[in-house]
């Protein structure tokens, strides 16, 4: 069984490393020679020329730019892979806008397609690496069986859902949910600062309740995934005022801390600055 991992960036690199431990005939592919050489240095076959494979794992970037969801790299990889092997199983691990996989299956006449979004987190790769529970949706029963066989062989536990679209949305909703949590914390922190109340002490207090897990508020919502994924979800479902409000909250928060950084005036702010000095960054 030949496996090709397409896209050797932050996600594709750990993926190809893991896959190559299980499947001897594994190749990494990327248009970046630098990315290819980084994989080769780890003793794994890689190239800027795409090879024929039985399974293609697509882990390239997707974007939200110029006001729309950009899935162009996904389509380009799908087109190239199916040109080499029309019967190959295509496994998307990238973030996809809802409906992307099905549209590509119809456009390029593929009957073997699955969506299994990554949940990899660089800051805690040992705990949240390639091997962790993942969501998988497939085009049909045959695709589902092939994809399950593949991921089971890799030792990756799978939660099966009924469609490609549910799997696509799961990644967007996960990251949007976290975005909303952080935006609420940002709003609350500004409220606390205006009223000379310690946000960190308040957060610690409310987090003692079993069903409360208030996020931290730091220097705005960053990372590669959170700001992008909430916009992609809005493209699909524009009539969600809560999401628009969260984006506005983060913009407002960023503007205020840029103008008047925390820790420069009241004692409560200095306490929060010190407490946050060792915080980990937000995940993606």
Regions found by a protein language model. Give the residues of each.
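Alpha-helix C-terminal capping/helix-to-coil transition sites in glycosyltransferase folds
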Residues: 51-52, 131
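NAD(P)+-binding Rossmann beta1-loop-alpha1 motif at the extreme N-terminus of oxidoreductases
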Residues: 1-51, 270-279
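NAD(P)-dependent Rossmann-like dehydrogenase/reductase catalytic/cofactor-binding core
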Residues: 2, 52, 145, 193-284
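Internal alpha-helical scaffold of NAD(P)-dependent oxidoreductase catalytic cores
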Residues: 105-114, 121-122, 126-212, 236-239
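Electropositive phosphate-/nucleotide-binding environments in soluble metabolic enzymes
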Residues: 29, 68-75, 98, 141, ...
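Rossmann-like NAD(P)(H) cofactor-binding subdomain of soluble oxidoreductases
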Residues: 52-55, 63-124
